[in-house]
């Protein structure tokens, strides 16, 4: 056997993208401030130092967090702990060709808190990065207060040939009932942000359906905040350096399906 990568804590979901890229859904804990999608390639180190004990010359008594940080490969997508769940499950690409709604090619991930997260990925300068959105369920955080409650935490998921989504729960996880739940698209397209991509000045938002010119033309209609986590041996991390980021300009597209935000 040849090791592929190191630095994992407890991934509960693994998956291959349609293009064959390998991702895992890591779980929060020591050296892991939050759950999130990790892109895995040969030789990567994903932050948890326990697996380094098999490396020649490794000395746990002298090895420091600073040394680990220099090798650390950041997650492609961070799921903010709390609003976007607390313990992730399997990751699944929408390969239904539109049978499940306007999210073809995007990623879905279940969570212990009875929700499903939606994520969109892009490759920038050879590295994967992306964004996550509330999608399904309800866990009483600000991001998930209006959806229907799922019966259990989600550990496994799969698409059926008809495009419906099956969500699987496992006994012993302490997150509600066991068994399967089936999600079917009702053919209605709700107004959502479909994707967010990085630009030189800020971000480009793409929507699932056209938005009004009045909505997109007003910078005050968009709120952007930032924060970061500590990388540390302690369990998890608080949100650090939270701050509002001013939206200085909005440039909507003529069809109302996208808008570019310029940030201060």
Regions found by a protein language model. Name each.
Residues 195-199:
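Short, solvent-exposed loop/linker segments at the N-terminal edge
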Residues 28, 171, 209-211, 263:
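A mature extracytoplasmic/lumenal domain signature
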Residues 1-190:
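Beta-propeller domains with acidic blade repeats across secreted/periplasmic ectodomains
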Residues 204-248:
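Short, surface-exposed alpha-helix to beta-strand junction/turn motifs within ectodomains of secreted
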Residues 121, 135, 244-252:
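Short, surface-exposed loop motifs enriched in S/T, G, D/E and P with embedded aromatic residues
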Residues 201-205, 259:
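Structural beta-strand segments of beta-rich domains
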Residues 251-264:
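A surface-exposed beta-strand-loop module
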């Amino acid at each position: 056997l040849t090791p592929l990568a190191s630095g994992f804590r407890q991934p509960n979901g693994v998956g291959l993208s349609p293009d064959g890229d390998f991702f895992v859904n890591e779980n929060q804990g020591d050296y892991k401030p939050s759950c999130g999608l990790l892109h895995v390639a040969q030789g990567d180190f994903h932050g948890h130092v326990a697996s380094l004990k098999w490396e020649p010359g490794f000395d746990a008594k002298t090895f420091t967090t600073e040394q680990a940080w220099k090798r650390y490969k950041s997650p492609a997508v961070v799921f903010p702990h709390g609003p976007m769940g607390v313990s992730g499950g399997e990751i699944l690409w929408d390969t239904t060709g539109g049978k499940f709604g306007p999210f073809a090619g995007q990623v879905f991930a279940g969570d212990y808190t009875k929700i499903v997260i939606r994520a969109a990925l892009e490759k920038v300068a050879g590295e994967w990065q992306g964004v996550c959105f509330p999608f399904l369920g309800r866990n009483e955080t600000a991001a998930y207060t209006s959806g229907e409650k799922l019966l259990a935490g989600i550990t496994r998921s799969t698409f059926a040939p008809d495009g419906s989504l099956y969500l699987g729960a496992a006994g012993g996880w302490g997150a509600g009932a066991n068994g399967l739940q089936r999600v079917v698209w009702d053919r209605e397209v709700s107004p959502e942000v479909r994707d967010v991509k990085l630009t030189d000045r800020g971000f480009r938002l793409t929507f699932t359906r056209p938005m009004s010119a009045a909505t997109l033309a007003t910078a005050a209609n968009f709120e952007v905040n930032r924060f970061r986590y500590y990388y540390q041996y302690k369990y998890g991390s608080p949100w650090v350096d939270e701050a509002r980021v001013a939206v200085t300009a909005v440039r909507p597209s003529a069809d109302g399906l996208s808008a570019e935000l310029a940030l201060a």
